[in-house]
Amino acid sequence: MDKKENAVLTVVGKNEIGILAGVATAVAEANGSVVQVSQIVMEDFFTMNMLIDVTDLNGTIHELETSIKEKLPRVEVHLMHDNIFSAMHSI
């Protein structure tokens, strides 16, 4: 069995309709799968962390990040492989 690969997505910005839907659409179009989502809306501010299964992704993680940014140009989007995320937080 192949090892599952995950990526960690962070989205921050002014709250508006369709942020979660835009991200989920981009992930599905790239053949990714949403594993877990945590989001908080504080007044006008939106924050979301998402764990995405990218094992069978069509394209690269960078291409998925670009697709999300194109769908949601008014929010900050950061996507990184969980190996990088784990390494950053284990030092």
What is each of the regions a protein language model found here?
Residues 1-91:
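A conserved regulatory-domain signal marking ACT and ACT-like small-molecule sensing domains
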